[in-house]
Amino acid sequence: MLTTLLFCGCKKKIDFGPDEGITYRDNNNNPVSKIDPSDWTLDGNWSKQEKKLFDGLGVDVNSTAQGVVRNISLYPNPIETQGNFTYSVTASLSLKLVVVDRKYKVLLNTTYAPPTVGHYAFNIDFTDSKFESGESYRMYYVFYQGSTLYYKGHGDIKMAD
């Protein structure tokens, strides 16, 4: 019985992949390492744990994406205190961002609603003490309009040493 409780109580951990799973970028958003092909692109189906991060959004995050979002990145990566999240859209969409640690503990949860189409870049503050030096985190993003999923994915980020 105790074994069952311990097994069921364990949370899955994020596997960031080989070579830290981070796409390193400089202060000008130029890649300075091998690019992780699973980061900053369209994801397939998310696990139950990943879907739960977006409960209450009113969007089926495992439905078929209805649009395209381009040029998604976060720089610099690793991050010292501030990160710039960038993307380009051809429709007026809302954006939900969730940053989690390797045990899926939510550290940042925010929504943006730019008024129109275009290229966007905005600053995210990572100075909170919950972001530890040298640690890796995962940022999930969902672009949506009403209850329609337009695009979703993730990117792995690291705090500078």
Regions found by a protein language model. Name each.
Residues I14-E20, R25-P31, I35-P37, R138-D161:
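C-terminal tail/sorting-segment detector
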Residues T41-A65:
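A general sequence property marking short-to-moderate contiguous segments
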Residues D60-S88:
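Surface-exposed, proline-anchored Ser/Thr-rich loop/turn motifs
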Residues L97-N109, S136-V142:
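Short, glycine-anchored, charge-dense loop/turn motifs used at functional sites
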Residues L107-V117:
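Solvent-exposed serine/threonine-rich low-complexity stretches and specific carbohydrate-binding patches
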Residues P115-S147:
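Short, surface-exposed loop/turn motifs with a glycine/proline- and acidic-biased composition
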